Amino acid sequence: MKNLLLTFLVVTIVCLDLGYTLICHQRHGLQTCEPAQKFCFAQTVMPFPNHPLTLMGCTYSCPTEKNAVCCSTDKCNR
């Protein structure tokens, strides 16, 4: 009986997702961040005149540019 309970406990621990990972918007859909990536970002860049491009996704640290948005909750960078 003890072996059965121990086996059940081990299987339960292995099957649980013990780590939390952040989910951020990216250009097309959602991205599950790596465990060390604690922030979502959105930043508009202008690669060509009059053609803005918004970059979105996970990041390790917040961008310092004035046109960047940084946040730390799921799907917050929309």
Swiss-Prot record:
Feature type site, description Key residue for inhibition of muscle alpha-1-beta-1-delta-epsilon (CHRNA1-CHRNB1-CHRND-CHRNE) and important for inhibition of neuronal alpha-3-beta-2/CHRNA3-CHRNB2 nAChR: M46
Site positions for Important residue for inhibition of muscle alpha-1-beta-1-delta-epsilon and neuronal alpha-3-beta-2/CHRNA3-CHRNB2 nAChR: H28
Molecular function as annotated in GO: acetylcholine receptor inhibitor activity; ion channel regulator activity; toxin activity
One GO location term (cellular component): extracellular region
Tissue-specific expression: Expressed by the venom gland.
Protein name according to UniProt: Short neurotoxin OH-26
Superkingdom of origin organism: Eukaryota
Cleavable signal peptide: 1-21
Gene3D superfamilies the record matches: CD59 (2.10.60.10)
Annotated family: Belongs to the three-finger toxin family. Short-chain subfamily.
Marked site (Key residue for inhibition of muscle alpha-1-beta-1-delta-epsilon (CHRNA1-CHRNB1-CHRND-CHRNE) nAChR) residue numbers: T44
Species per Swiss-Prot/TrEMBL record: Ophiophagus hannah (King cobra)
Residue pairs linked by disulfide bridges in the UniProt entry: C24-C40, C33-C58, C62-C70, C71-C76
InterPro entries, sorted: Snake_3FTx, Snake_toxin-like_sf, Toxin_cobra-type
UniProt entry keywords in alphabetical sequence: Acetylcholine receptor inhibiting toxin, Disulfide bond, Ion channel impairing toxin, Neurotoxin, Postsynaptic neurotoxin, Secreted, Signal, Toxin
Site (Key residue for inhibition of muscle alpha-1-beta-1-delta-epsilon (CHRNA1-CHRNB1-CHRND-CHRNE) and important residue for inhibition of neuronal alpha-3-beta-2/CHRNA3-CHRNB2 nAChR): F48
Role summary: This three-finger toxin binds and inhibits the nicotinic acetylcholine receptor (nAChR).
Record keyword Disulfide bond present: yes
Keyword match Cytoplasm: no
